[in-house]
Amino acid sequence: MAAAAQRLLAASTKIVGVGRNFVAHAKELGNPVPKEPVLFLKPTSSFLHAGVAGAAIEVPEPVESLHHEVELAVVISQRARDVPEASAMDFVGGYALALDMTARELQSAAKSAGLPWTLGKAQDTFTPISAVIPKSDVANPDDLELWLKVDDELRQKGSTSDMIFKIPSLISYISSIMTLMEGDVILTGTPEGVGPVRPGQKIKAGITGLIDVEFDVQKRKRSFST
């Protein structure tokens, strides 16, 4: 079971992000609380797998405000299209701890111009992710404590119990719009406390009692615009 869960990420075709899925986080950024899920896409090339020697979150020039967002990732086990909420959990193969790294000034500029968030969300190393936790190892995904520290300072701590849209609702909604494939990842949103990280700092994050990860932050050697 564990080996099968680890193989899922290798098959992933896309990462579906869910924005503003915690009331406190929506409010801390001055956003309204959504009435339906706010979705965005990230490419699988943005994955940064925990435990890989030398792997680090890269801050590209000229980004000055790269923010951390700790999230529960849901990993899909099989093709899912128009899935009803009642059977949505049958399509979950496992979970992971993920970070939705966000170049905040690029995202804010895109939002102001009415443009997609791609530059702020989709760059290489912007989705650090843990190993997959088999579904059978998670008794209640609606009651998991997420936490994140920067240089041992606690920045984020929250529970998936505070998510506005729960996992079955997200799977049903997303699969009504696009087909979810085996290995696809849903980032379910972040609790409050997001903030910037700088090159030279270290991020530690985890799901209490299940898994923890750490990533170094370094400056990318080239600007994303050259």
Curated annotation (Swiss-Prot):
InterPro entries: Fumarylacetoacetase-like_C, Fumarylacetoacetase_C_sf. Requires a divalent metal cation for activity. It catalyses: oxaloacetate = enol-oxaloacetate. One of its GO terms (molecular function) is acylpyruvate hydrolase activity. It holds the Pfam family FAA_hydrolase. Mg(2+) binds at residues 69, 71, 100. Keywords: Isomerase, Magnesium, Metal-binding, Mitochondrion, Transit peptide. It is found in: Mitochondrion. Its cofactor is Mg(2+); Mn(2+). One of its GO terms (cellular component) is mitochondrion. It is an enzyme of class 5 (isomerase). Residues 1-30 form a transit peptide. Its EC number is 5.3.2.2. Tautomerase that converts enol-oxaloacetate, a strong inhibitor of succinate dehydrogenase, to the physiological keto form of oxaloacetate. Belongs to the FAH family. This is Oxaloacetate tautomerase FAHD2, mitochondrial. It comes from Oryza sativa subsp. japonica.
